[in-house]
Amino acid sequence: MEINATTLWRDILAVRTKAPLVHNITNYVVMNSTANALLSIGASPVMAHAEEEVIDMVTIAGSLVINIGTLSKAWVAAMHKAMKKAHELQKPIVFDPVGAGATPYRTQTILELIHETPPSIIRGNSSEIKALVEAGIKTKGVDSTESSESAIEAAKHLSQKYGAVICISGATDHILNQEEYVRVENGHPMMTKVTGLGCTATAVVAAFAAINPSMMEATAHGMAAMGIAGEIAAKNVAGPGSLQVNFLDTLYSLSEADVHSHLKICA
């Protein structure tokens, strides 16, 4: 594993050059913002959740995003199919357990999906990650009520059980597998006031996973790119509304100098 400003910039250029197709089965709230962020970083988004076409879509995609934000029975069936096909084709699956712990149905659905087809990467906030391991943990909607540090032991358990890279997002992003750990400290507090930026991070990570076979590197690079863009974008905005627009512009124009001057990462 090698994660630094040079490798991050290398992968940003690779995403821009290769424009990987990222297949998203995601929620209604974030479809537009997620697609725009993927376009801004240089990837090609597709939002397809019809059970009748997900196998074909996964076949041509570079990676798969499963985001359970707005659950329905039909979407869950499509998620099962898409994950099985991606696993069969050895394509990265990036899973976002939105609101895990909020309701029994939501938590059980997540556990069934990842038990049947373990994902390559799981990205969630600390409450969501802990809810997948500990009974009785409650989340407040999709917002975390726990510190990211408190979820590290739960993340280690999940990684061991499913063989996945686990990303606990927060003010500091903790990324680990069974052998490696990295901490990303980029971002800005105002990013929490823009709905869907966590879900967007999951999709951006999937773009990097499509071009880098190291899931640890891909996760760290994706989270760092999001955080750096958020930091720069927040410098000259009045509030969350203008941040959302400026974030996309910054992600699009992110430069090698930006990466080298802003990256805060500890491996």
Swiss-Prot record:
Cofactor: Mg(2+)
Pfam family membership, one: HK
Pathway involvement of the protein, from the record: Cofactor biosynthesis; thiamine diphosphate biosynthesis; 4-methyl-5-(2-phosphoethyl)-thiazole from 5-(2-hydroxyethyl)-4-methylthiazole: step 1/1
EC number: 2.7.1.50
Enzymatic reactions: 5-(2-hydroxyethyl)-4-methylthiazole + ATP = 4-methyl-5-(2-phosphooxyethyl)-thiazole + ADP + H(+)
Family, as annotated: Belongs to the Thz kinase family.
Descriptive protein name: Hydroxyethylthiazole kinase
